[in-house]
Amino acid sequence: MARVCQITGKKTRTGNNVSHANNKTKRTFAPNIQKKRFFLSEENRWVTLKLSTKAIKTISSKGLSAVLEKATAAGYLKKY
C-alpha cells in the first residue's frame, strides 16, 4: 500500500520548492504516516492501521470504533 492514511485519506501531494531567487522546482509533500496497533474491544482483537499523526490524535479523542465506522463510510477503509 502507498503512503496513504487509512482514516483521513491523506496522501502524498506535489508542490514547489521556491528559492530566494523565486526559482521553482517540483517536490513532494509526504504525510507523516505511522503504523500503529489498536485493541478493538468490541471484537476482542488487535487492529493494525497505517495512520497520519492527525488520525492518531482523532482516535485518542473520539474513540477507535467511531473513527473506524466513519472511515469505512467515507470509503477510506475497506477492511480492518
Curated annotation (Swiss-Prot):
Annotated Pfam families: Ribosomal_L28
Residue numbers spanned by region Disordered: 1-23
GO MF annotation terms: structural constituent of ribosome
GO CC annotation, single: ribonucleoprotein complex
Single Gene Ontology BP annotation: translation
Domain of life: Bacteria
Keywords on record: Ribonucleoprotein, Ribosomal protein
InterPro entries in UniProt: Ribosomal_bL28 (IPR026569), Ribosomal_bL28/bL31-like_sf (IPR034704), Ribosomal_bL28_bact-type (IPR001383), Ribosomal_bL28_sf (IPR037147)
NCBIfam families per record: L28
Family named by the database record: Belongs to the bacterial ribosomal protein bL28 family.
HAMAP family listed in its UniProt record: Ribosomal_bL28
Protein name: Large ribosomal subunit protein bL28
Organism: Cytophaga hutchinsonii (strain ATCC 33406 / DSM 1761 / CIP 103989 / NBRC 15051 / NCIMB 9469 / D465)
Origin organism lineage: Bacteria, Pseudomonadati, Bacteroidota, Cytophagia, Cytophagales
